[in-house]
């Protein structure tokens, strides 16, 4: 049944999936999505639909788009935010201040910061995911950053790097 549901979600136009999510939230008594939340979800809908088997599963993956700052970081994700990782996030935040906000440019900037710190991209992506989403599972960090936009992404990173001080 989940396979059929996931296949159906994957084939639906993005706006119809969003409408189905809003109906689901209404039926479960959850708050309606704000305009900002809808925009963020639509911006990453392709990635969300790839993994989704059910509407609740899609909503779980879209959680990053619905939470407000400061992001509450789950215990498991907090382990990714040690002093060294926060230092790399500080460097990345500075590197992202003025560049392009395209997915490719974001990924290249992250790769440069990882290389400068002698680590692979995954060692930077984990704390980046924790800072942006507050958890260890989410869509791609670069998809999240493009959906959240420059201002919100940098603010979430700054919130976490401020905790290191």
How should these model regions be labeled?
Residues 2-29, 111, 147-165:
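Non-catalytic terminal extensions that flank enzyme cores
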Residues 13-117:
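Small-residue-rich helix-loop
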Residues 9-12, 56, 133-140:
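Short helix-capping/linker segments at secondary-structure and domain boundaries
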Residues 2, 15, 42, 46, ...:
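Non-catalytic, well-ordered alpha-helical scaffold segments
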Residues 104-164:
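Charged substrate- and nucleic-acid-binding regions of tRNA-handling and nucleotidyl-transfer enzymes
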Residues 2-7, 46-54, 119, 130-134:
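Core structural elements
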